[in-house]
């Protein structure tokens, strides 16, 4: 391969979900979001329940206190993120909703220290059509603010598969092909909605990082995607090749035609039956004009997957300090270095087993 296919659009970096806005007042969650922003870098942070008692907004109130909302938006802006606010309202009348929104808009339009024009909005699927129409007119016509065309489906389901290495190829494949919305993926796990817990480590919440601050395989799907270049060189099922300056990036991931449906199983044991697929790939890179340093990042069920390490520990319901430290330190892709002398054709071969991903970076020296 030696021809470019155009710009590689990293749309997966546009939005990161955090769930309840109130969760961004919790220091552990803020630490996770800061690391996500540092290592991946998103554009918007989508939050729900901005207009709720947790945020100091109560049904029947004649005055609305926006202190918590301001603190959150100020923090978000400090991370070079912009707020995407879901317009969902619980236990408020239509009259109250309009009063709340009017107060919100007047307050943040006048307040100093925030770029209010960067705010975006999106309707909850449950909001009344006539009410949403009225709100949209206020936001767009009176304040010149953007409202997304599609509505947001509030998602609070759990699925044990979200914790597993299966999410590596699933997220990568759907991200590079823009096949399905990953709107349910969140920055971090939260405990407040979990009723039938069996442990405090992994409980099937769709966060990239669990409640102990341990990164899941899904985190590294985005981590590896973000290391891709901005120019698309080649793409097919199971791999994508990009480049930037004097560097090529080859991201390989395990692929089979049915794996996109496996989330419907909601059971780790069932997806184990499909994981014995082996993917072999061979890619030729042409016209490398100098010696090449090769860096490989590998993550799979046997290497780098916090969930599988936890299983190997015997699925402890609660982590001891030492166990937590082990999971923190070991949950990272395995890194290998190689060196290749100048050649007309550089052949890259790789074998992927089970649910896995491999990023190969070629740097001209």
Question: Which residues does each predicted region cover?
Answer:
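Short catalytic/ligand-gating loop segments at beta-alpha or beta-beta junctions
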Residues: 232-242
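Well-ordered, non-membrane alpha-helical segments in soluble/globular domains
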Residues: 26-31, 62-71, 97-107, 130-138, ...
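Catalytic-core region of carbohydrate-active enzymes that cleave or remodel glycosidic bonds
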Residues: 132-231, 275-277, 287-289
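Hard-cation-handling environments
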Residues: 240-258
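Conserved, mostly hydrophobic/aromatic
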Residues: 15, 45, 76, 104, ...
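Mature N-terminal, pre-catalytic/accessory segment of carbohydrate-active enzymes
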Residues: 1-43, 47, 59, 67-68, ...
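C-terminal beta-sandwich/jelly-roll accessory domains of carbohydrate-active enzymes
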Residues: 256-365
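Substrate-binding cleft and catalytic face of glycoside hydrolase catalytic domains
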Residues: 37-156
